[in-house]
């Protein structure tokens, strides 16, 4: 019922997530942040079972920060993605698996921007664009049609809005507000939330 999306540009990664926290068919909150700051230039987006998402994301977050304190430098997005995948895979084979779907976005001085897609079975893939949730079925075709590797930030935001408008039109559930952030060489930046008003019938 949740939705995550990421778009990688030539020198940035644009990500967005819905802000609804739901329990079964009940909306509990409409201002829930599903993005977790791993380091100055790495962001983890996490959806899934309510308890699992926060517990797993915070566990990864604290371990990435511990790595920096021990070694004096931060993990690269690639290293953070592989560390996250390994932990998710280990938990999957234990008595306490986490049911979480993830996007990891980051920027590295040497490798540039990176976007990683990971599902609850710990399958990891580097992708130019990615989405999680039922909304992904409705928007991946739009991303495939309009995405280019050299897409500018302005065009990426337009493409993001096009995807979210498609969700409002075709998705039966109400996801009215989305958090939007950009990761680039200067760090993580908050963009203005994208909000849709309910259509009157």
From Swiss-Prot:
Keywords from the named record: Acetylation, Cytoplasm, Nucleus, Proteasome
Gene3D superfamilies given in the database record: Glutamine Phosphoribosylpyrophosphate, subunit 1, domain 1 (3.60.20.10)
Induction: Down-regulated by theophylline (THP) and 1,3-dinitrobenzene (DNB), two reprotoxic agents thought to induce infertility.
Secretion signal, residue range per the UniProt entry: none
Domain of life: Eukaryota
Cysteine disulfide partners in this protein: none
Subcellular compartments: Cytoplasm; Nucleus
An example Gene Ontology biological process: proteasome-mediated ubiquitin-dependent protein catabolic process
Residues bearing the modification N-acetylmethionine: 1
Purpose: Non-catalytic component of the 20S core proteasome complex involved in the proteolytic degradation of most intracellular proteins. This complex plays numerous essential roles within the cell by associating with different regulatory particles. Associated with two 19S regulatory particles, forms the 26S proteasome and thus participates in the ATP-dependent degradation of ubiquitinated proteins.
PANTHER family (alphabetical): METALLOPROTEASE TLDD, PROTEASOME SUBUNIT BETA TYPE-1
Quaternary structure, from the entry: The 26S proteasome consists of a 20S proteasome core and two 19S regulatory subunits. The 20S proteasome core is a barrel-shaped complex made of 28 subunits that are arranged in four stacked rings. The two outer rings are each formed by seven alpha subunits, and the two inner rings are formed by seven beta subunits. The proteolytic activity is exerted by three beta-subunits PSMB5, PSMB6 and PSMB7.
Family of the protein in this entry: Belongs to the peptidase T1B family.
Name of the protein: Proteasome subunit beta type-2
Source species: Rattus norvegicus (Rat)
Gene behind this protein: Psmb2
């Amino acid at each position: 019922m949740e939705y995550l999306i990421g778009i990688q540009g030539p020198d940035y990664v644009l990500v967005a997530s819905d802000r609804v926290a739901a329990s079964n068919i009940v909306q509990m909150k409409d201002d829930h942040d599903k993005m977790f700051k791993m380091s100055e230039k790495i962001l983890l987006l996490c959806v899934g079972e309510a308890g699992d998402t926060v517990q797993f994301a915070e566990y990864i977050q604290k371990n990435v920060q511990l790595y920096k304190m021990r070694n004096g430098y931060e993990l690269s997005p690639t290293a953070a993605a592989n560390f996250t995948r390994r932990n998710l895979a280990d938990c999957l084979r234990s008595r306490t698996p986490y049911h979480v779907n993830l996007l990891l976005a980051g920027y590295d001085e040497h490798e540039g921007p990176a976007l990683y897609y990971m599902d609850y079975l710990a399958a990891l893939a580097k992708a130019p664009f990615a989405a999680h949730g039922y909304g992904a079925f409705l928007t991946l075709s739009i991303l495939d049609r309009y995405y280019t590797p050299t897409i500018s930030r302005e065009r990426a935001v337009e493409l993001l809005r096009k995807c979210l408008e498609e969700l409002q039109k075709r998705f039966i559930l109400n996801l009215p507000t989305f958090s939007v952030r950009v990761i680039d060489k200067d760090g993580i930046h908050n963009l203005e939330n994208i909000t849709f008003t309910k259509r009157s019938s």
